[in-house]
Swiss-Prot record:
Residues 1-28 are annotated as: Disordered. Pathway: Secondary metabolite biosynthesis. Disruption phenotype: Abolishes the production of most pyranterreones, but accumulates pyranterreone 5. Keywords: Methyltransferase, S-adenosyl-L-methionine, Transferase. It comes from Aspergillus terreus. One of its GO terms (biological process) is methylation. It holds the Pfam family Methyltransf_23. This is Methyltransferase pytC. Its EC number is 2.1.1.-. It is an enzyme of class 2 (transferase).
Amino acid sequence: MTVRTAAEPPNRIEVDMDAPSLDTDSSCTSLSSSVQRYEYKHGRRYHGYHAGSYPFPNDKREQDRLDMIHHLYTRILNDRLFLAPLDPRGKAILDIGTGTGIWALHMGDAHPAARLIVGNDLSPIQPSWAPANVRFVVDDVEKDWVDRHPYDFIHCRYMAGSIKDWPRLIRQCYAHLRPGGWLELQESVNVMYSEDGTLPPDSFMARMMHGLIVACEKIGRTMDPAPSMEKWVQEAGFDPITKHRFKIPVGSWPKDPRLKECGSLMRVNFVEGVEAFTASLFTEVLGWTPEEVAVLNTGVREEAMRNDIHAIFDFVVIVAQKPY
């Protein structure tokens, strides 16, 4: 078993002391009828196919947020769509939980010589247009995979809170990869911290993240898979395995221009996305009243706009190969 740890991010993110805080007022195919049916609650739209499997909305507001997250993660990876040592030419590629399909679309545009790029999701929210080598399917990856197509590369990103049995999912990835094929998992470690003590443990942002973890554990869908991903791919038989770790700030307080940009996007993610995070899980699972959730959401938005709180997430990428 070969496990490599790639170069760690810098020890600390340098703070731009001139970065201002902001006001919260300044803010981003053919299918069956059952698949196209949606649920509406909390003023938002949710998927109807295998309802409840994904606890967050899928409406236009959420789609815009997911596209922004794609840009954020791509920037964190220095404008790379993947880290696996893969030449996509002639390869079959799967994007698990494709969401709006933006990663698959960008892969198709960037690598027109890739033989096939498939994006699957519970929600049919992908565009009808796509590069010639890209197609989308509505499917539940937690069930037995109907598609028996062997892949050369499987990409799985931002699925925290969506999967009940991660080891089983990773075993299915292993089974559907060709020998020598690659699996890449990308997830944030969903416990916030600061390097200078500016994020109190009782902050609204920290309380929200803790509540999301507790709520997802109650429904059997871990909100923090990142710390366990390396172990799961080892147990599935992948070898070699490389672990990469990056830092994502919340806010425009870093001096580094790229981190400042990424932090600004993560700030928007909190300000615009907090309602989507908390609406269902905090009321239906944790038993909070709508008024209590509204107070939390307001506090999260206000803290995210402050540049004197230097909150950080770690972002983990696991790159693992199926042996020949």
